[in-house]
C-alpha cells in the first residue's frame, strides 16, 4: 500500500484510495469490505480516530492504535472567521508544527486554499509565509486533512482547491500530486477545479505536465505562475529565487505546459504601490504574456506589519487592469477576503507564534 508516514515512522491512512485500503485490510487478515468501510469513514464521514469507526472490530482498532497506525488528522489550534465568513484555520501537525488553511465562501462555491509546506524557502519579500524559512514539506495526509478540516469547520463541501497557501508546491510535487489524486478520486473534486500555484522551480516546471500525467493519468489542473513583475530585474528584487529562472525561460516552460495539457496558464500579479503598479508596468506585462492562451489575475497587496510595501489605491488598480484589457489580455481582479482576520498567507501563523 502506498501510504504516507507521520514523523517518527507512524503510518497514516488518510490519502489512501479505496483499492489500497481494501488490499491493506486483506493483508491485515480482515475481509476486503473492511477497507471499503474505512474509506467511507475517512472521506465521507471525516473520522478523526479509530475509536469513532465503530463498524470495525474493536480488537483490530486496538491493534492499529498499538502499532502506531493513525487516521492522520491534524489538530485545530486556532480559528479566525472574517465578517465575510472567510475562515482561516491554524492546524497543528503531530510533530508540533503549524500550518494555515483558508476557506473562501461565495454563494455558489467554497474555495479552499491549502498549504504544501511548513513555512516556505522562496523568501518572496512581500509574503509572510517565507519570513521564518522552511521547516519541512507536508506529507500527503497533511495536505488532504486541510480540506476535511475546512469542510468540518464550515459545514460545507469544498468545490474548488487552490494550492496558494504556505510553501512552494513544486518543491513538494510528489505529495501534492498524490493529494490531488486523492481529492479528485476519493473526495470527488474535479481536477479542473484544482489550481497549483508556483513562483517557478526550474528543475520541475519544465516537466510538470509529463509528471502529472504519469502520476494522475492526465493533467487537467490549472497552473498558476506567480510573475509579480513584467521583467527579470524587478522580479529578482521581489523574488530572490528568480535569479535562477530567466523570465523568458519561465514563459517558454509555461507555453510547454499549455501545449501538452491544453490548459491555459494563469499568471498571478500582486500589485505593490508605486513599485510594479504603474501603466508602463502593465504595458510591459501585456507585451510579455500576449500571444499564447493565458489569463492574468491581479491581486492587491495585503499589508504585512513589518514590511514597507503599500497597497495601491483603487484608481491605480483599475488603471492597471484597464491597460491590460485594452491590449487584449484576459484579466481579472481577485477580491481581497479576510483582511480583518489576518487571513493573508502566513499572517495568522506568525501572530500565533508571537503570542504563544
UniProtKB/Swiss-Prot annotation:
Enzyme Commission designation = 2.1.1.192
Q: Does the keyword Disulfide bond apply?
A: yes
Main site of residence?
cytoplasm
- Name the residues that bind [4Fe-4S] cluster: 120, 124, 127
Relay the cofactor remark from the entry: Binds 1 [4Fe-4S] cluster. The cluster is coordinated with 3 cysteines and an exchangeable S-adenosyl-L-methionine.
Q: Where in the cell is it found?
A: Cytoplasm
Q: Please report a single Pfam family linked to this protein.
A: Radical_SAM
EC class, as a word, reads transferase
Q: Ligase: is it a keyword of this entry?
A: no
Give the residues the record marks as binding S-adenosyl-L-methionine.
167-168, 197, 226-228, 302
Disulfide pairings: 113-345
Active site residues according to the UniProt entry: 100, 345
Question: What region holds the Radical SAM core domain?
Answer: 106-340
The Swiss-Prot or TrEMBL record lists the needed cofactor(s) as:
[4Fe-4S] cluster
| GO biological process, alphabetically ordered | rRNA base methylation; tRNA methylation
**Which HAMAP family does its entry note?**
RNA_methyltr_RlmN
PANTHER family associated with the record: 23S RRNA METHYLTRANSFERASE, RADICAL SAM CORE DOMAIN-CONTAINING PROTEIN
Function text: Specifically methylates position 2 of adenine 2503 in 23S rRNA and position 2 of adenine 37 in tRNAs.
Kindly give any further remark recorded in the entry: Reaction proceeds by a ping-pong mechanism involving intermediate methylation of a conserved cysteine residue.
Q: Identify this protein by name.
A: Probable dual-specificity RNA methyltransferase RlmN
Amino acid at each position: 500500500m502506498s501510504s504516507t508516514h507521520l514523523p517518527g515512522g507512524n503510518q497514516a491512512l488518510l490519502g489512501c484510495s479505496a483499492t489500497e485500503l481494501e488490499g491493506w485490510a486483506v493483508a491485515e487478515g480482515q475481509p476486503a469490505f473492511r477497507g471499503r468501510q474505512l474509506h467511507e469513514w475517512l472521506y465521507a464521514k471525516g473520522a478523526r480516530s479509530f475509536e469513532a469507526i465503530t463498524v470495525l472490530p474493536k480488537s483490530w482498532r486496538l491493534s492499529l492504535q498499538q502499532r502506531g497506525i493513525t487516521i492522520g488528522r491534524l489538530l485545530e489550534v486556532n480559528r479566525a472567521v472574517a465578517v465575510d465568513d472567510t475562515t482561516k484555520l491554524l492546524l497543528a501537525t503531530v510533530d508540533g508544527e503549524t500550518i494555515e488553511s483558508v476557506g473562501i465562501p461565495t454563494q455558489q462555491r467554497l474555495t479552499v486554499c491549502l498549504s504544501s509546506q511548513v513555512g516556505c524557502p522562496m523568501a518572496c519579500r512581500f509574503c509572510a509565509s517565507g519570513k521564518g524559512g522552511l521547516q519541512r514539506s507536508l506529507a500527503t495526509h497533511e495536505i488532504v486533512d486541510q480540506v476535511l478540516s475546512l469542510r468540518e469547520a464550515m459545514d460545507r463541501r469544498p468545490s474548488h482547491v487552490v494550492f496558494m497557501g504556505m510553501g512552494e508546491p513544486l518543491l513538494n510535487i510528489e505529495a501534492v500530486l498524490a493529494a490531488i489524486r486523492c481529492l479528485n478520486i476519493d473526495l470527488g473534486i474535479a481536477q479542473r477545479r484544482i489550481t497549483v500555484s508556483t513562483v517557478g522551480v526550474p528543475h520541475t516546471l519544465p516537466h510538470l505536465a509529463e509528471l502529472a500525467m504519469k502520476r494522475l493519468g492526465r493533467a487537467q489542473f490549472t497552473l498558476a505562475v506567480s510573475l509579480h513583475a513584467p521583467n527579470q530585474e524587478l522580479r529578482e528584487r521581489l523574488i530572490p529565487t528568480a535569479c535562477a529562472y530567466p523570465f523568458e525561460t519561465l514563459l517558454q516552460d509555461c507555453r510547454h505546459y499549455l501545449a501538452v495539457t491544453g490548459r491555459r496558464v494563469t499568471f498571478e500579479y500582486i500589485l505593490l504601490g508605486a513599485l510594479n503598479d504603474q501603466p508602463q508596468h502593465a504595458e510591459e506585462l501585456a507585451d510579455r504574456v500576449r500571444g499564447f492562451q493565458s489569463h492574468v489575475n491581479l491581486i492587491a497587496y495585503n499589508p504585512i506589519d513589518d514590511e514597507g510595501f503599500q497597497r495601491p489605491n483603487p484608481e491605480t488598480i483599475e488603471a492597471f487592469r484597464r491597460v491590460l484589457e485594452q491590449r487584449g489580455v484576459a484579466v481579472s481582479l481577485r477580491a481581497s477576503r479576510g483582511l480583518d482576520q489576518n487571513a493573508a498567507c502566513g499572517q495568522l501563523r506568525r501572530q500565533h507564534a508571537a503570542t504563544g
